[in-house]
């Protein structure tokens, strides 16, 4: 008799016999992506177990910019080691909150981890919702020029005079970049002007036909209907405060979170810091975090909808029906999605 197993919905189905890899033994790179709160983490764990059931080992690589930071657990919904089902996880808790982990820092490290996983003959599952971080690994992605001294000057200018003068100069150099940058985000304004001043493309975007870094790549998007996602995200934010986010942030202050350019501005953490300083009450901190989280989720959906060949599914549908061996090893750009995309 063929072995049988129960899937996430409780249905008992025959387990397929292990098959050889489609690309002459070449391990694959998976990317499980989507908006925050859609169930990417659970799906990635289920996928790794499905692969293991087919005789293929898999390891998970973090592609969430905030989960790189040690001690930032509750506000990032980081999965505790005890809940990782014995599956190796990489690039979680990689830097201190006082440090800055940029996408340019992340890309070579993530790719090195993927190469190490593939060298062991295992599949790598990249999971996260930070679009730029995912793209930097999955696609042939090059970064605009950098000048640390120039950026330091621009950051000082922002502190002294705000973003308005920088936006005016950016508009003179690159009108499209000025129109597209988030004027409320000083870091984005500084970076855009830095790149424009160096003669580069200030706006980082996927090309019309992006090339995959590894041909044996499969892109899986997790989508949730908009109304359901909004309710889920609002509930998650309230749950973070109930779970002790304020105490977590207070414990991170001696570790330098207030000095961390990225960590201190993370959604939820910036609001918790403001509450601890007495600038807002808890209700206002939660409400602002909910608003920013919903806005961020919309941007994530827009980003991932542009991925060619991505296969969209709901988290529960993916656990029941995602076949880890179908179209195995074929480039994502050659696959035809069979599941509708995320809600508009």
How would you name each of these model-derived features?
Residues 2-344:
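Phosphate/pyrophosphate-binding catalytic cores of soluble transferases and nucleic-acid-acting enzymes
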């Amino acid at each position: 008799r063929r072995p049988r197993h129960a899937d996430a919905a409780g249905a008992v189905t025959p387990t397929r016999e292990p098959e050889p890899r489609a690309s002459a033994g070449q391990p694959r790179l998976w990317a499980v992506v989507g908006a925050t709160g859609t169930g990417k983490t659970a799906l990635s764990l289920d996928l790794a177990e499905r692969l293991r059931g087919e005789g293929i080992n898999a390891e998970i690589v973090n592609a969430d910019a905030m989960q790189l930071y040690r001690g930032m657990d509750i506000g990032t919904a980081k999965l505790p080691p005890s809940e990782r089902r014995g599956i190796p996880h990489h690039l979680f808790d990689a830097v201190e909150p006082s440090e800055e982990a940029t996408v340019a820092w992340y890309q070579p490290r993530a790719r090195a981890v993927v190469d190490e996983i593939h060298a062991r003959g295992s599949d790598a599952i990249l999971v996260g919702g930070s679009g730029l971080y995912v793209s930097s690994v999955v696609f042939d992605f090059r970064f605009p020029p950098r000048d640390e001294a120039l950026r330091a000057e621009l950051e000082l200018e922002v502190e002294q005079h705000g973003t308005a003068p920088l936006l005016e100069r950016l508009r003179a150099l690159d009108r499209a970049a000025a129109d597209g940058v988030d004027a409320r985000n000083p870091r984005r304004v500084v970076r855009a002007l830095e790149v424009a001043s160096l003669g580069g493309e200030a706006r980082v975007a996927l090309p019309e036909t992006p090339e995959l870094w590894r041909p044996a790549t499969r892109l899986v998007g997790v989508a949730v209907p908009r109304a359901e996602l909004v309710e889920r995200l609002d509930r998650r934010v309230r749950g973070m405060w109930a779970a002790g986010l304020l105490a977590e942030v207070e414990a991170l202050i001696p570790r330098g979170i207030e000095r961390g350019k990225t960590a201190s501005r993370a959604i939820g953490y910036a609001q918790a810091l403001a509450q601890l300083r007495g600038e807002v009450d808890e209700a206002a901190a939660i409400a602002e975090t909910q608003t920013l989280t919903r806005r961020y989720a919309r941007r994530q959906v827009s980003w991932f909808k542009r991925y060619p060949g991505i296969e969209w599914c709901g988290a529960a549908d993916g656990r029941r029906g995602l076949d880890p061996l179908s179209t195995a090893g074929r480039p994502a750009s050659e696959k035809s999605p069979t599941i509708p995309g995320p809600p508009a």
